[in-house]
Structures are given as C-alpha cells and as structure tokens.
Amino acid sequence: MTIRAGAETFRGRWLVGCDGGRSTVRKAGGFEFVGTDSEFTGYSVEVEMADPDQLSVGRHYTPTGMYTYARPGTIAMVEFDGGAFHRLQPITLEHVQAVFRRVSGADVTLTALKLATTWTDRAYQATAYRKGRVLLAGDAAHIHSPLGGQGLNLGLGDAMNLGWKLASTIRGDAPAGLLDSYWSERHPVGAQVLDWSRAQVAIMRAARSSRALEAIMRDLIDTRDGATYFAERVWGVSLRYDLGGNHPLVGRSAPDFELVDGTRLGELIRNGKGLLLDFDVSAPLEALASRWGGRITYVASDANDRLGLSAVLVRPDGFVAWAGEATPDLEEAARAASRWFGEPDEALLSS
C-alpha cells in the first residue's frame, strides 16, 4: 500500500493506524466509527484571579456541571448542556470566565489565562480493528473521556497485543487466526472502557439520582474489596482474556515472578518470543519447548514465590497461555504452544 504525505511517499505491506482520535488512517480505510456524542465540555485551566478566597478547595457539583478547585489558579470544570466548544476555536480568558461563572455560580474575576485545554465525553469505537492489511490501535480505534486516565493503558494494551501477532504474521510463522485474535481480545476491552467512562459521566450529573449513585460508589470504595475492584478495573490489571485452560491465571497478565537469581519475568519476555518458565527444572518441558525452535524461550529456575505452579507459558505480551501445577499436563502445554506459536518444527520432532 502507498501513503502520500505532502512531498513524501511511504510504501509498506502493512499499515497500523496509531494516529489518534481523528485518525486519518481510520477515515481513509473506511472503518465505521460508532458511539455516543458528548454531553459536556470539560476545561482544565491555569488562571490568575482577583479573589481566590471566594472558592473552597475540592470538588463541587452545581446545577450546570461541576468544578474542582485544587490550588490557587488550577481549575477543572465540566459544563453540561452548554453547547459544544469546537476544538479549533481559540480559548480566551473571556470564554473561560463566562463558563466558570455559569458552572460555579461564583462571582470570581479571572485576570489572566496561563494555560487551557478542552475535552469531552464523546465515546466512539471502530466496529472493526482490521481491514486486510490495515489495522487500528489506540485512540484511532476508540475514544472516550479522559476521566480516570484509562486511555493510556487501553492504547498500550492494544499495541502490546497487536505487535507480536503482527510480527509473527509477517515472519510467516503465525498459526491460523492469530492476527484475528487481536480484534476478538481487544475490542471487548475497549467497549468496556467506553461504558465505564459513560457511567462516570452519569454520576457527575447534578440530578438527585446521580448523587445517590455517587454515595453508593463511595461506600463501595471505602471497603478494601471495593477499592481493589475499582482500582484493578481502571488500571486494567483485572483483565482476563478468554483463552480457555483450567487454571485461573490463564488469560491474565503474568505475575512478575522473581527467580532465585534475582531475574524477573519481565526481563525475560523482552525478546518478542514466548517464554516457558519451568520452576521444577523438568526435562520433558525442556524437550517440549525445544520443538518450537526459536519461537519459545525455555528458562529453568525456581522462583521466590511460584504461587504453587510447576511451570508457566507466557505470550510475548505478558499474558499467561498455560499454567501447570504439580505434574504438568504436557499435552495441554503443547496445545497452548501450538495455538499461539504455530505448529512445532517437523525437523525437530523427527530428530
């Protein structure tokens, strides 16, 4: 395919659009982008004001929106039903002053605007992440409000999931359907984040029902289990792909095991290959890994806390493909290896 940008021309066999929420690749590729339009315009500003003592620090809900006053000069505010603010419009002191008075109801005079940015809760997602040799990742595939900071983890997760699968496809050693699993694994995660961002917007409304929902949320977050649940969901660490398998770790991000020599799992998966980590130093597992040649790295070492496992097979993106307890099931391990790294090398099988 050929991409022309001004006087430059780029050619490649594959194209991955990671070019943001207004993605040129997505539009040129004809990807359908569906979702919900914004209900508010958000502003994050640094200002100088004549009478800062009129404002109290903290989050404040009002009939027209909400604002957070963190320290003198720093304001974040959301205006519902105030009309869309076009991103190409200049953000002037007069505009920020008018919005702040509408939202806060406070007769505070802003005297200087140092920094300003706007954002919305527009939530859209591509109905497909791949068309032939063109793929989407990050904000090109999905957009949502920045509340909770979920977009960074979401986009990085796309890149980690896609990168090794595309590399395997280009090398020619990918098993059937590997690249399609990018869509089946990542699209539901994106949809879930969009729904969570919509739920956050519902709670921000001034309606009595929204305040009741917020009170329930606060009660839940005040508990250890509730706080853990919400933190894991927002940070993405509770994610589990449906990869089959009988162990609860399969489909989850692998724990960063520390081996007895101090090496950590994260250091062992930076080469883009699968990793078979054998805590029991088992000859049959070493032989199994060797059947995949250079596609799977075999490491035999105990760990300081192996979580009751005898061995674990980890994909290049850090997710567990297979986990064994006590006497490992070699057939199950081989099936997992074939699913993610292709069939074993016939020459190695016969040797």
Q: What residue ranges belong to the model's regions?
A:
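Helical substrate-recognition/capping region of FAD-dependent monooxygenase/halogenase enzymes
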Residues: 98, 102, 168-351
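Core Rossmann-like FAD-binding/catalytic domain of the broad FAD-dependent monooxygenase superfamily
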Residues: 1-214, 218-221, 347-351
